[in-house]
Design a protein with these regions (language model features):
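A glycine-rich helix N-cap at a beta->alpha junction
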Residues: 2-6, 10-11
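Metal-dependent amide/peptide-bond hydrolase catalytic core
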Residues: 10-30, 34-212
Length: 212
């Protein structure tokens, strides 16, 4: 069975985690899932000189705005595990905060969301990546399409994300489906209590001076 994989993944972060002064080398213990959804909105076609209220681009824009304003739910387990693995490199104050997540959850959430790296660690991410609608400036298109890309946190699932998307959009005239070849579930989380993990951890510390 494969013990570990070394590729271009991971990073050395500086100043990203509050309460940690040293650079932090990230060792991936899981792989996020992937889901690209194609959204398609239908509307009444026509001429721009006489626009109606049922415009495809407007309907699609409202759906995308709702998805952008309502990110997927927060789960702090991965961030808590990271803090625990950093041990004494984490300030006492931050250790206290993460030992009492039940009380400090709103503060942790606010700080994590302020940084794109830590925000991606606490939730399934939502990215609006492609939009297509209309072929001429004075023509109302009959439909408009967009691609929204999600990176699934381990423990989340394609079915759960699709269900949330449906509830967030709340518009039966906006259909969506996974892009062909663009959907796979997140992996399971590997244990850090293994010989291969410890070897990798000690090797990184020898190669990159001063990292934790």
């Amino acid at each position: 069975r494969l013990a570990a994989m070394v590729d271009e993944g991971g990073a050395i972060m500086e100043g990203t985690i509050s309460g940690v002064n040293e650079p932090v080398a990230l060792i991936g213990t899981a792989e996020k899932g992937h889901l690209s959804l194609k959204l398609r909105a239908e509307g009444t076609p026509g001429h721009s000189s006489m626009p109606g209220k049922d415009m495809a681009i407007g309907r699609l824009a409202r759906a995308l705005t709702r998805l952008d304003a309502n990110p997927q739910p927060v789960r702090l387990k991965a961030l808590k595990d990271l803090i625990n693995n950093l041990g004494s490199a984490v300030s006492f104050g931050m250790q206290f905060v993460f030992s009492n997540i039940w009380f400090f959850r709103p503060i942790i959430k606010m700080q994590a969301e302020a940084n794109s790296t830590t925000n991606a660690m606490i939730r399934t991410s939502t990215a609006l990546t492609m939009v297509n609608g209309g072929i001429k400036e004075n023509v109302l298109p009959a439909n408009a399409e967009a691609i929204v890309n999600f990176r699934l946190l381990p423990g989340d699932s394609i079915a759960k994300v699709c269900d949330r998307v449906r509830k967030i959009i709340k518009d039966d005239k906006v259909e969506f489906e996974p892009v062909a070849g663009g959907a796979w579930e997140a992996s399971q989380v590997s244990s850090t209590d293994t010989k291969s993990y410890l070897i990798l951890k000690h090797t990184i510390r020898k190669v990159f001076d001063g990292v934790v």
